[in-house]
Amino acid sequence: MSIIIRVEDLRAVYLVREGTIKAADGISLDILENSVTAIVGESASGKSTIIEAMTKTLPPNGRILSGRVLYKGKDLLTMREEELRKIRWKEIALVPQAAQQSLNPTMKVIEHFKDTVEAHGVRWSHSELIEKASEKLRMVRLNPEAVLNSYPLQLSGGMKQRVLIALALLLDPVVLILDEPTSALDVLTQAHIIQLLKELKKMLKITLIFVTHDIAVAAELADKVAVIYGGNLVEYNSTFQIFKNPLHPYTRGLINSIMAVNADMSKVKPIPGDPPSLLNPPSGCRFHPRCEYAMEICKKEKPKWIRLDGEAHVACHLYEEGRPLK
């Protein structure tokens, strides 16, 4: 598979009254065409910042300090707004976090589809709009006759999430980015959304990138997993290898903390300590205050981004020292 998006040394911050939040610090990864990539990490680790920086949709206090995001060889970060508008939604579509709340409660679903089309300069007749919207709603297992003339308050959380996925697919993008697509949903609805995304990926041969704090969700859906900690990318590998042989101590901690119905509770171990403040992150490796393998160098120097065998990448001094996890 070829690379459809290449992220190089992406750095983004938020300017707040207390100082500068260092939310994405030197992120580099390749997204393969027709693949599913999960960006995984604890809450407030910088996951959403990465995709918002990639798509230039950061809030007003967000700043991109450096880096490149190459899509089909062109840097999205240096494009003028009018150039980006030709790509957004038509080629790269984003379903943001807490998207269920982004539907206007005073507008019917069909009006949301109409607004999306008009905002991107697409000229469809009313009958074409109904036909296209109905097609996308059926793709996400919704009945267009019942949903198109409904207001958001008449829909369940899972239905609203599927409406937003249908809206994102309306102009047939080649890349679909979803920020926490299963958060705030009950377990059964989460399972339905995951299954739906699997079907859409297979049907449309689309590239999916999704953010989640739940590594078990990544296991269900992703081909590759990018593990984020404290605004840093600490591991990037195939999903199979991430679970078979986690390279970074943080990745191992995430996997060991997974709760399952049939789990041996004696083997379920939470990661000790708390995530770092991105306002005043620890020196060196940001995970070192919580890491049982921490060495003196971990407190002083940020580890290098190392490529190991195959697809494996890791940022950990253990590998620089020739002492991998066992």
UniProtKB/Swiss-Prot annotation:
Membrane topology note: Peripheral membrane protein
Matching CDD domains: ABC_NikE_OppD_transporters
Entry domain remark: Contains an N-terminal conserved nucleotide-binding domain and a C-terminal domain bound with a [4Fe-4S] cluster. The C-terminal domain forms a stable loop region and interacts with the N-terminal domain.
Role of this protein: Part of the ABC transporter Dpp involved in dipeptide transport. Responsible for energy coupling to the transport system.
Intracellular or extracellular location(s): Cell membrane
Positions annotated to bind [4Fe-4S] cluster: C285, C291, C298, C316
Name of protein: Dipeptide transport ATP-binding protein DppD
Keyword hit for Transcription: no
Disulfide-bond pairs as recorded: none
GO term, biological process aspect, one: protein transport
